[in-house]
């Protein structure tokens, strides 16, 4: 039951999905959506619904509805029916129909007597109101999609048309859906109108029903039609403003027919001979490639305007009808027109079957259709697909067998002992001079580059073309391409039948075939012969006089119409302003650049021949509405922009409305509220932040206001002229009238007040004031020089050291510090500047708000206030003195009085004490003495207490004598009692203790009493001051708590880093101990996966491999599995067990998989290969998926110092910088020379090619664990020796006997070689500069080398620790590719910028020091200094041509080195002249090295763009403004110093050096290089050829001259000779495929790939198993194969990646962080079958 329910549920779901995805439902949905695309056409329908009433009103409603529906039906039909769509979509038809109709409709509704027929009946035909309502709704529904931009919902219909098979059903259903939506909309409108009529509150409005407004309401109802027409007109004008009509567009001047021939790659396939005229496909654009033939003189050129057709008179047929950007193609000098999709579907034959090609040339398909319509006999009969496929497969099988036989024959010839040079297939080259053996350049060689070749020839100027020139050259000008497209014919027989043809015009290059030539096909029918006669009679010439045959030409006159072609070679308005356009370019700009004006700021008049001008482009501050669009283009498809301000700087679409600052009513930002609440808790710096924010907002508002004022002056007519004259008049009035009058008035007043006049000081300040004329944007010129075109462009007047009238000048000698400070302040005010306004005011910036002048009367009022203050304070000082003296006298009197009272009381007490008798007890004299002493003490203490009590109550004793007597009596009693108590206590003590003890205890009691009294005093003082102490403690505690809280994150992070550091160090130390224990018991195992990082003095620098350099990618390709050698400890201890027969096969297989040893006795069983997906492997490395922002956080500013301070091995002899530089230069020179000579070694090339093949092996994973790695084992010895030989390594003879490789034998320093030339050969000696990969070395483990004692740091690789001077290199994948080490180390700090910088610019740093040849200075780059730069910036074709020139000039250098250098410079200049376009004649002048370098870079490296640093740009402009003034001054010191003090001129960007190279500008951060996407059509065939043809072996590489051999022997050291003499198994690298040429090799590979019958493969990803077909072959296991190892190595199977270009492009995405948007398919691997040995 559950199964049945689920089955029913599944059926229901599938049924629902089918219904939803059906054509009818989707059509209804899209039709319903188009209802909401409400446009101006709805205005007529609503007006008919609202306004018209009665019987006529109902008819109008019906007619409006029917017209509306009919118009929408026509729109839907036009989607399906192409002619109707073209008729409605033509811009001239819409313009002709729409604009007059709109005009007629506007006048009809606004003019009362326009169509007034008087009283007519309803049935008369003259009443056109109902018909007009129908037409209005019909026509405006058609206009809505074409003349007015429609909604996006209406365009969704066209999207679904590509997916839908039954298009008519979709159109019908969408119309029905629209009809349903329209009916619902109309019903809703009717309900709204009924609700308005029935609502009494609206109808019973007092204002509407009042008598005052009845007339207005009636007028409003009568003129409703006029209001609707006005609304319609406004909407139409608004829409047409964004999409101008073609009738008002800009007409471009027609370019002459003598322009360069341009076109696409299909049109460039021309012969190598010069073609002075274009071919029949004269137009470069594919769409307009109709037949056009050359005519001597055309009658249309002399036609009057009324004789021309109406369409060409009104409309510009050369108009660019889309808002296209103009992109110039450097190679063919034509525009890139991409109006269509890059995919064009058409049927073609592929693999012998009719298939749909998605990149078919659209012009070819349209031409086929035209020919088939015009000539019925041209249609071919369709043959069965099986017949075609079998015939095609037989031909390809035959070709494959022939190639296989040829390859086997060549291999057999190699076995017989033939030389390799004779066996290898040579590339066929075209030569144009057999005696000198000069070949064509490779870019023009048809045997190398196929269809991508082409030579562009310029026609002579139009004035030179005459009739004689045409008649002389007309014979060889017609290169007909149609015969190659239509049918295959035998051209020799065809030339015999048509004898009057010129043989040169129809001759085709004969292809070379290694086997039999293709069979000649005959013309089977007479119809085909008629076709070719029809096509070729047009250019049939007479053999005698070579004149055109007029008879056939007149018959073919209809086809010679002028083809509408686009005008190209347009220049922008900016280029016109800069004045750098070319000679043959029209002066009128055709591109709308950003609105700007060219302002000349300096002219050099010293040279009489030519005037150099320095100019700046002043751009308008408004939004750039032009956006580099071609003039005359219609902008209907531009993004919709809305303007709501008078001057809007940043216009944007309403889509981005949420990004602008909105009002509080329209936005509720919760995050902002949270921030405000949290900010309120922070009480510190709250006010300061508010003030800063207010100031920033105020500055933004002020800047916006200034821009608006500047734009208003610049936009209105004659505004700049009026402003300029006003400024000059204000300047003259200020300088010569107002200020002198003020000086006279001031000094005359001083004289009247009997003060010394200050004529000299005032006149000195007045003369110092300068009125400098500036450009409109503030560039200073001089006092007398006006800027060019200042009346139209505008002017500013800057006042330097403005004069301010002062009431007096202070004296020079002011000693006090306060006076000095005032003086510096006054000096700063003097050095200030200001700009003059129209009203004579002063502003800090142009068009800024007026600033306050220092007031003349303010210092006077200050001085008066001071003096009045002094006068007021004099009488009060006398009174104060008297008061102070009176208070002192009173105090003295009080003190005397108190002293007298104290003395009188003391005398009285003494008298009483003396009058009392002394009681002497019956004891010894000693005891009496002691008792007397105690009594005295007690009396003194009592006396003190008594005195205190007397002091406290002295006032009471004065008042009453009775109280005094009582107190005295009480005191006496207390004393006597106290004395008695003391005596009793003492007696008791004496009875128990001795006399000495008694004396000691009494002293203790007395000290205790004293301490207690002191404590009492201190306690009272502490209580009094405790309040302040508590406050102080609270403050200190709060400060300490705050500091502790702020230090918590720092402490925790520090503890965390220290803990992680210690943990990692312990972990590393333990691992190292384990590995050392294992390595003591085992031998060296050469395997790449066990590479250990170099550790200097127990230091581990964790260089992160996240940089993903090129070397790392290759390293990961070669590393497949990691073996765990700890499990094989017992096996690895003995080498005997490896070759033993008693070891298990599993262990042998494991060792064989890892490539540890040669296992020769085991049978070779080959594995089944699987497709390893490159992209999935890259995706698995998730750590490389970081965004660029995360990488940017790791960048440090001092990475350069780290790189320069790094060193590999410290050599104590290299102490001086000079000796190091010299040695470095010698080593680099030797390495470069040795590398250049290694190029000529064929063995080196074979080894290099085999390294690439090794990585191809490694890129495949094995399905079985049994994997033959004999290739990697055999590579070991040769690769090690080649690496040591190449890099000049000493002591290599001992490497075989050493367990580890010592770094000290290496003499190359990776980190200190900043110039990359020794590692990447940029001196044009190599063809592949960036992709050069040298032979690598398989190293197992490197020992620790003892360097200087350094601390162990975890973050050392980031360059954060400056104290590290010699960090070691731990990434040993660079041992295989040392060229890429510097790239990778810098790539880790700046992973998206540094590789581009280093690859392009670092070779500029290498400058030859030991130059012994003296040369004359030329205007071009010196050959030795910047030769590498020149060759790098040239493209590869020119570089190869320069290689040949350089190799040929080597012989001349020995004979005459100076002449050889000059010749070499000439050839370089010739190459540069060909690559660079010709400038105007007045611009041909000598340039500096930096200018030429920049030009070369910008022309050749079109994939990158240079831009200024944004902060640096403003600094340069400020400096330029000051420079322009300083140049014109005789003594500029004062103004220069003042401008530096004001901050106008920054010293950090001054040009101290004369010649700044581009690399230095990059390092300083002045120029920034960025990748940019350009729509330049790259030479795809050339890229494929160079990528796949890596192993190209040329003939000249096998020849080594004698002098090269001698130099090689000299350069080889004794250690290198040991490595060279070692046995090298070069045959192991050899691939049988390399015998064939690259072209034949590709053909052989493709033919093998076509045979897909017996191939078995599976994808590693299981989800693709069902979809992917068989792609690879499995090696056939044959029993008759020889098991001898040498033969197996010779006929080893070879893996070839079928799509290596995709592999490299995918890797390139990770090297340089560049993507081109293509989706790369997986790598498909093909394996050759093994050849049997006879």
Curated annotation (Swiss-Prot):
It comes from the Eukaryota. The chain crosses the membrane at residues 19-39, 68-88, 91-111, 133-153, 176-196, 227-247. Keywords: Chloroplast, Coiled coil, Membrane, Plastid, Plastid inner membrane, Protein transport, Transmembrane, Transmembrane helix, Transport. The keyword Transmembrane applies. Pfam families: Ycf1. One of its GO terms (cellular component) is chloroplast inner membrane. There is a partial copy of the N-terminus (positions 1-302) of ycf1 in the inverted repeat (BAF50510). InterPro entries: TIC214 (IPR008896). Belongs to the TIC214 family. Residues 1433-1485 form a coiled coil. It is found in: Plastid, Chloroplast inner membrane. The keyword DNA-binding does not apply. It is a multi-pass membrane protein. This is Protein TIC 214. One of its GO terms (biological process) is protein transport. It comes from Lepidium virginicum. Involved in protein precursor import into chloroplasts. May be part of an intermediate translocation complex acting as a protein-conducting channel at the inner envelope. Part of the Tic complex.
């Amino acid at each position: 039951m559950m199964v049945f329910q689920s089955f029913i549920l599944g059926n229901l779901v599938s049924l629902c999905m089918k219904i939803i995805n059906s054509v009818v439902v989707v059509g209804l949905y899209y039709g319903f959506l188009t209802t909401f695309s409400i446009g101006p056409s709805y205005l007529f329908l609503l007006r008919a619904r609202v306004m018209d009433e009665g019987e006529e009103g109902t008819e109008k409603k019906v007619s409006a509805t029917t017209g509306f529906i009919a118009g929408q039906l026509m729109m839907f039909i036009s989607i399906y029916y192409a002619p109707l769509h073209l008729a409605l979509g033509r811009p001239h038809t819409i313009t002709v129909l729409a604009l007059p109709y709109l005009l007629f409709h506007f006048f009809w509704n606004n003019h009362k007597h326009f169509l007034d027929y008087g009283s007519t009946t309803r049935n008369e035909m003259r009443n056109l109101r109902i018909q007009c309502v129908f037409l209005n709704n019909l026509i405006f529904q058609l206009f809505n999609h074409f003349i007015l931009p429609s909604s996006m919902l209406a365009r969704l219909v066209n999207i679904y048309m590509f997916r839908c098979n039954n298009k008519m059903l979709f159109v019908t259903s969408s119309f029905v859906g629209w009809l349903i939506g329209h009916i619902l909309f109309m019903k809703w409108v009717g309900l709204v109108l009924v609700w308005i009529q029935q609502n009494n509150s609206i109808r019973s409005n007092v204002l509407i029903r009042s008598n005052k407004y009845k007339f207005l309401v009636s007028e409003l109802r009568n003129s409703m039609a006029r209001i609707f027409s006005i609304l319609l007109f406004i909407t139409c004008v608004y829409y047409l403003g964004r999409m101008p009509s073609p009738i008002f567009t800009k007409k471009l001047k027609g370019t002459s027919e003598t322009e360069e021939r341009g076109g696409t790659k299909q049109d460039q396939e021309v012969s190598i001979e010069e073609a002075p005229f274009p071919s029949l496909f004269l137009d470069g654009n594919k769409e307009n490639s109709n037949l056009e033939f050359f005519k001597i003189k055309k009658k249309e050129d002399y036609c009057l305007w009324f004789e021309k057709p109406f369409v060409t008179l009104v409309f510009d047929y050369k108009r660019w009808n889309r808002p296209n950007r103009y992109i110039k193609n450097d190679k063919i000098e034509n525009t890139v027109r991409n109006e269509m999709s890059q995919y064009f579907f058409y049927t073609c034959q592929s693999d012998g079957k009719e298939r749909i090609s998605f990149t078919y040339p659209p012009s070819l398909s349209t031409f086929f259709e035209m020919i088939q319509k015009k000539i019925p006999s041209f249609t071919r009969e369709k043959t069965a697909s099986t017949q075609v496929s079998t015939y095609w497969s037989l031909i390809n099988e035959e070709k494959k067998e022939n190639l296989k036989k040829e390859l086997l024959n060549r291999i057999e010839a190699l076995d017989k002992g033939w030389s390799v040079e004779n066996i290898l297939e040579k590339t066929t080259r075209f030569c144009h001079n057999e005696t000198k053996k000069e070949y064509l350049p490779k870019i023009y060689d048809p045997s190398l580059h196929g269809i991508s070749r082409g030579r562009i020839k310029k026609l002579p100027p139009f004035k030179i073309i005459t009739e004689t020139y045409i008649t002389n050259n007309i014979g060889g000008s017609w290169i007909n391409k149609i015969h190659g497209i239509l049918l295959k014919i035998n051209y020799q027989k065809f030339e015999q039948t048509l004898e009057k043809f010129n043989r040169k015009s129809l001759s085709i290059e004969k292809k070379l075939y290694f086997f039999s030539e293709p069979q000649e096909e005959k013309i089977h029918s007479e119809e085909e012969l008629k076709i070719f006669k029809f096509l070729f009679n047009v250019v049939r010439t007479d053999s005698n006089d070579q004149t055109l045959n007029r008879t056939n030409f007149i018959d073919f006159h209809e086809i010679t119409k002028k083809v509408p072609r686009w005008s190209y070679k347009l220049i922008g308005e900016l280029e016109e302003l800069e004045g750098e356009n070319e000679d043959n370019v029209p002066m009128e700009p055709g591109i709308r650049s950003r609105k700007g004006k060219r302002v000349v700021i300096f002219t050099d008049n010293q040279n009489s021949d030519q005037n150099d001008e320095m100019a700046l482009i002043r751009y308008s501050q408004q939004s750039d509405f032009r956006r580099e669009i071609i003039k005359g283009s219609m902008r209907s498809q531009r993004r919709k922009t809305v303007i709501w301000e008078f001057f809007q700087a940043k216009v944007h679409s309403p889509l981005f409305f949420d990004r602008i600052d909105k009002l509080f009513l329209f936005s509720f930002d919760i995050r902002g509220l949270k921030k405000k609440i949290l900010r309120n808790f922070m009480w510190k710096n709250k006010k300061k932040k508010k003030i800063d924010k207010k100031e920033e907002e105020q500055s933004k508002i002020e800047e916006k206001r200034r821009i608006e004022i500047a734009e208003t002056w610049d936009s209105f007519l004659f505004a700049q002229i009026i402003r300029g004259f006003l400024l000059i008049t204000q300047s003259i009035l200020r300088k010569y009238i107002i200020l002198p009058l003020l000086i006279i008035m001031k000094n005359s007043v001083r004289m009247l007040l009997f003060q010394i006049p200050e004529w000299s000081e005032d006149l000195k300040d007045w003369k110092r004031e300068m009125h400098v004329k500036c450009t409109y944007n503030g560039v200073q010129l001089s006092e007398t020089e006006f800027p060019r075109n200042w009346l139209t462009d505008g002017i500013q007047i800057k006042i330097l050291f403005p004069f301010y009238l002062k009431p007096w000048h202070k004296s020079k000698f002011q000693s006090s510090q306060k006076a000095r400070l005032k003086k510096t302040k006054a000096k700063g005010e003097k050095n200030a500047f200001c700009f003059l306004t129209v009203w004579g005011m002063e502003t800090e910036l142009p068009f800024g708000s007026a600033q306050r002048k220092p007031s003349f009367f303010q210092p006077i009022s200050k001085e008066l206030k001071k003096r009045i203050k002094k006068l007021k304070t004099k009488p009060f000082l006398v009174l104060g003195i008297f008061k102070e003296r009176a208070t002192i006298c009173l105090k003295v009197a009080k003190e005397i009085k108190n002293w007298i009272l104290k003395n009188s009381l003391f005398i009285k007490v003494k008298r009483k004490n003396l009058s009392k008798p002394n009681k002497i007890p019956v004891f010894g004299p000693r005891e009496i003495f002691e008792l007397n002493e105690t009594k005295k003490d007690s009396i003194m203490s009592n006396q003190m207490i008594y005195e205190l009590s007397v002091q406290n109550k002295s006032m009471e004793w004065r008042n009453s004598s009775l109280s005094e007597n009582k107190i005295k009596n009480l005191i006496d009693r207390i004393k006597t009692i106290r004395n008695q108590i003391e005596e009793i206590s003492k007696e008791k003590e004496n009875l128990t203790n001795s006399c000495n003890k008694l004396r000691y205890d009494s002293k203790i009691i007395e000290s205790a009493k004293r301490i207690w009294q002191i404590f009492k005093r201190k306690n009272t003082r502490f209580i009094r001051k405790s309040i302040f102490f508590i406050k102080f403690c609270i403050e200190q505690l709060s400060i300490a708590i705050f500091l502790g809280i702020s230090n918590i994150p720092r402490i925790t992070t520090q503890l965390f880093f220290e803990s992680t550091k210690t943990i990692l160090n312990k972990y590393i130390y333990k691992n190292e101990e384990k590995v050392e224990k294992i390595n003591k018991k085992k031998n060296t195992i050469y395997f790449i996966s066990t590479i250990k990082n170099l550790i200097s003095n127990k230091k581990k620098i964790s260089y992160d491999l996240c940089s993903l350099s090129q070397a790392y990618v290759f390293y990961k390709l070669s590393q497949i599995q990691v073996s765990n050698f700890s499990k094989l400890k017992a096996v690895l201890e003995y080498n005997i067990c490896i070759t033993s027969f008693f070891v298990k096969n599993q262990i042998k297989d494991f060792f064989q998989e890892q490539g540890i040893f040669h296992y020769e006795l085991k049978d070779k069983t080959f594995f089944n290969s699987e497709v390893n997906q490159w992209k999935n492997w890259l995706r698995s490395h998730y750590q490389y998926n970081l965004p660029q922002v995360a990488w940017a956080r790791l960048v440090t500013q001092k990475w350069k110092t780290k790189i320069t301070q790094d060193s590999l091995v410290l050599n104590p002899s290299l102490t001086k910088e000079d000796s190091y530089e010299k040695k470095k230069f010698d080593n680099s020179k030797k390495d470069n020379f040795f590398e250049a000579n290694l190029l000529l070694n064929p063995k080196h090339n074979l080894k290099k090619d085999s390294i690439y093949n090794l990585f191809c092996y490694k890129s495949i994973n094995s399905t079985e664990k049994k994997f033959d790695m004999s290739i990697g084992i055999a590579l070991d010895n040769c690769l090690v020796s080649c690496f040591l030989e190449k890099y000049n390594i000493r002591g290599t003879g001992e490497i075989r006997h050493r367990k580890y490789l010592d770094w000290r034998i290496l003499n190359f320093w990776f980190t200190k070689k900043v110039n990359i030339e020794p590692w990447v050969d940029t001196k044009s000696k190599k063809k592949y500069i960036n992709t050069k990969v040298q032979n690598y070395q398989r190293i197992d483990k490197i020992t620790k080398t003892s360097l200087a004692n350094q601390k162990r740091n975890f973050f050392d690789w980031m360059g954060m620790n400056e104290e590290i001077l010699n960090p070691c290199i731990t990434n040993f994948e660079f041992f295989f590719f040392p060229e890429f080490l510097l790239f990778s180390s810098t790539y880790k700090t700046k992973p998206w910028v540094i590789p581009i910088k280093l690859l392009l610019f670092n070779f500029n740093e290498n400058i030859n020091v030991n130059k012994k040849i003296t040369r004359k200075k030329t205007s071009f780059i010196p050959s030795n200094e910047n030769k590498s730069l020149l060759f790098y910036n040239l493209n590869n074709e020119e570089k190869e041509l320069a290689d040949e020139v350089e190799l040929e000039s080597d012989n001349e250098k020995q004979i005459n080195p100076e002449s050889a250098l000059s010749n070499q410079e000439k050839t370089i200049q010739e190459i540069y002249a060909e690559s660079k376009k010709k400038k105007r004649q007045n611009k041909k002048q000598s340039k500096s090295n930096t200018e030429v370098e920049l030009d070369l870079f910008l022309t050749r490296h079109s994939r990158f763009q240079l831009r200024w640093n944004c902060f640096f740009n403003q600094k340069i402009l400020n400096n330029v403004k000051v420079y322009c003034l300083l140049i014109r001054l005789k003594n500029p010191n004062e103004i220069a110093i003042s401008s530096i003090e004001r901050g106008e001129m920054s010293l950090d960007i001054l040009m101290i050096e004369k010649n700044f190279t581009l690399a230095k500008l990059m390092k300083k951060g002045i120029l920034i290089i960025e990748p940019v996407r350009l729509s330049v059509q790259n030479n795809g065939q050339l890229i494929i050829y160079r990528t796949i043809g890596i192993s190209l072996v040329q003939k000249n590489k096998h020849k080594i001259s004698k002098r090269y051999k001698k130099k090689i022997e000299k350069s080889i050291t004794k250690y290198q000779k040991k490595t060279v003499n070692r046995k090298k198994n070069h045959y192991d690298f050899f691939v049988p495929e390399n015998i064939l040429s690259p072209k034949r090799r590709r053909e052989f590979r493709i033919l093998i790939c076509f045979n897909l019958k017996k191939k078995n493969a599976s994808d590693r990803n299981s989800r693709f198993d069902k979809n992917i077909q068989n792609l690879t072959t499995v090696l056939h296991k044959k029993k008759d194969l020889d098991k001898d190892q040498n033969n197996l190595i010779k006929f080893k199977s070879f893996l070839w990646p079928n799509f290596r270009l995709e592999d490299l492009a995918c890797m390139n995405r990770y090297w340089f962080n560049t993507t081109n948007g293509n989706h790369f398919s997986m790598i498909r691997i093909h394996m050759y079958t093994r050849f049997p040995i006879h």
